[in-house]
UniProtKB/Swiss-Prot annotation:
Transmembrane domains' residue ranges: none
GO biological process, one term: viral genome replication
Keywords: Early protein, Transcription, Transcription regulation, Transferase
Name the record gives this protein: DNA primase
Compositional bias segments (type: Polar residues): 257-266
UniProt subunit comment: Interacts with LEF-2.
EC number of this enzyme: 2.7.7.-
Length: 266
C-alpha cells in the first residue's frame, strides 16, 4: 500500500465534517493494510492527527455513536462497470445529482467523491433523517431508489427517484435521443449500498479521508453539482423553475407510485 501524507489541515477538514467528533470512536486502516479499532475518543483534531501519524494510518472510518446512539443517513453509491475515468465521473455526477434532486438541497449536508469509484451523500439531521432512526425506517426509505427491471417514461411520476435520475441524465447527456432515455436512465441508475444506508451499526468513511483503493483523498463535490443545476435551471433552489420535485398523487401501477419527495415521505 502506498504511503499517504495527512496534514493537520486535512485532519481539521475531516474533524469539522464529523458530527459529535469528540464523542464517537473511529476505525483506522494502516498503510500495512491492518485495521485498528481504537477504543478511545479524541478531544481535538490535533489529537486525531497525532494518532494518524503515529500509527501510519491510511483510511479513516467513523463509527456510530455508542450505546445505540445511531449514525448519520449516508447514501453510498459505487460504480463497478465503467469504460474510463471520464465515464466513471459522469456516472458519479449523474447519480449524485439525482439524489440532490430527490432529497433537495435543504436536506443534503454534503456530497463526497470517495477517492475511488463512487460518492457518499450525507443527509442533514432533521426530523425526517434522525441520527437515531431505526433500521426498519431506513429500509423503508431505501425502497424508494431500488433499481427497477425496466422503465417506461409514460409511467414515471414527477417526484419519484426514477424521475430524478431521468432529469439528471438529461442534464449531463444533453444530445441524446428521447427514444434512448429509458435505457440511459437505467444505465446511469446509481448502485446504492443497502447495508450502509440501512444498517445503523456500519462504520462509514470519514469525509476528506484517504482511500487506499483509489489512492486519492475524498473531496467535496457539492458545489460543483449545485452550480451545474443552477446554471441549467436558473430558478433551482429559489422556488423557481427546474425539475419537478413536488409530490403528486400517483395512480397505480405507475413507476414511482411509492416514491414521493422528501417533503412528504423521506
Amino acid at each position: 500500500m502506498l504511503v499517504c501524507n495527512y496534514t493537520q489541515k486535512r485532519v481539521d477538514m475531516m474533524w469539522d465534517a464529523i458530527a459529535y467528533n469528540d464523542s464517537r470512536k473511529y476505525a483506522f486502516m494502516t498503510v500495512n493494510a491492518r485495521w485498528i479499532h481504537a477504543d478511545r475518543y479524541f478531544d481535538t483534531s490535533a489529537q486525531l492527527y497525532s494518532y494518524i501519524v503515529q500509527n501510519k494510518v491510511s483510511d479513516v472510518h467513523v463509527k456510530p455513536l455508542d450505546d445505540g446512539g445511531g449514525r448519520e443517513w449516508v447514501v453510498d453509491a459505487d460504480y463497478k462497470n465503467y469504460v474510463d475515468e471520464h465515464d466513471l465521473m459522469l456516472k458519479i455526477y449523474i447519480g449524485a445529482t439525482a439524489f440532490l434532486l430527490f432529497y433537495t438541497e435543504e436536506n443534503v449536508s454534503r456530497v463526497m467523491y470517495t477517492g475511488n469509484r463512487g460518492f457518499h451523500l450525507w443527509l442533514k439531521f432533521t426530523d425526517k433523517f434522525k441520527i437515531t432512526s431505526a433500521q426498519n425506517v431506513r429500509v423503508h426509505r431505501y425502497k424508494a431508489f431500488e433499481k427497477p427491471a425496466k422503465l417506461d417514461s409514460d409511467y414515471i411520476q414527477p417526484g419519484s427517484f426514477a424521475h430524478c435520475v431521468r432529469e439528471a441524465v438529461r442534464l449531463y447527456v444533453p444530445h441524446m435521443q428521447d427514444s434512448n432515455l429509458d435505457a440511459l436512465t437505467l444505465q446511469y441508475w446509481p448502485d446504492v449500498d443497502r447495508d450502509i444506508f440501512c444498517n445503523v451499526n456500519k462504520q462509514i468513511r470519514a469525509p476528506y479521508s484517504y482511500n487506499y483503493k483509489g489512492t486519492k483523498f475524498s473531496r467535496c463535490i457539492t458545489k460543483e453539482l449545485l452550480d451545474k443545476l443552477k446554471q441549467c435551471y436558473p430558478g433551482y433552489g429559489t422556488g423557481g423553475c427546474g425539475p419537478v420535485t413536488t409530490t403528486t398523487t400517483p395512480s397505480p401501477p405507475k413507476i414511482g407510485s411509492m416514491q414521493t419527495t422528501t417533503k412528504s415521505t423521506t
